Swiss-Prot record:
Protein name: Uncharacterized membrane protein C21C3.06
Predominant place of localization: cytoplasm
Domain of life per record: Eukaryota
Gene Ontology CC annotations of this record: cytoplasm; membrane
Coiled-coil region: none
Regions crossing the membrane: 9-29, 60-80
């Protein structure tokens, strides 16, 4: 019976719900762990000056990576909802069809089209 209720949920909605909850939980975990001042730092000012920039970099990297992944997932879900596809495979096929201009296409006589070419094709 629970499976029947889940069958009516669109894939896009499920992905959006999971990405939103993942973003909220990861933000909470970051706030509770690495964004806090860790207890293992010594009161030594030399060690503090050596480790402090690394800690700031780690905080920025962690926050921006979580934010980037959640924003990408959220944007993908919005795009999928806008174009009317329900799963990732359809979205990939749609993108492949629409972005066909970006595929490499063979150019006829590309070597011999230059006036001063030194390659002879026999």
């Amino acid at each position: 019976m629970a499976f029947d209720k889940l069958a009516n949920v669109a894939t896009v909605d499920a992905i959006f719900a999971i990405s939103s909850s993942t973003f909220l939980w990861s933000t909470w975990v970051l706030q509770r762990t690495i964004l806090k001042r860790p207890n293992f730092f010594s009161p030594n000012p030399v060690v503090e000056k050596m480790v402090h920039p690394t800690l700031i970099t780690w905080k920025l990297f962690s926050f921006t990576s979580v934010l980037t992944v959640s924003t990408f997932t959220f944007a993908s879900c919005l795009i999928m909802r806008t174009i009317g596809v329900e799963n990732i495979k359809e979205f990939g096929l749609y993108a492949r069809e629409k972005l066909s201009f970006a595929r490499a296409k063979p150019v006829k006589d590309d070597i011999t089209s230059f006036p001063n070419h030194k390659i002879s094709i026999t």
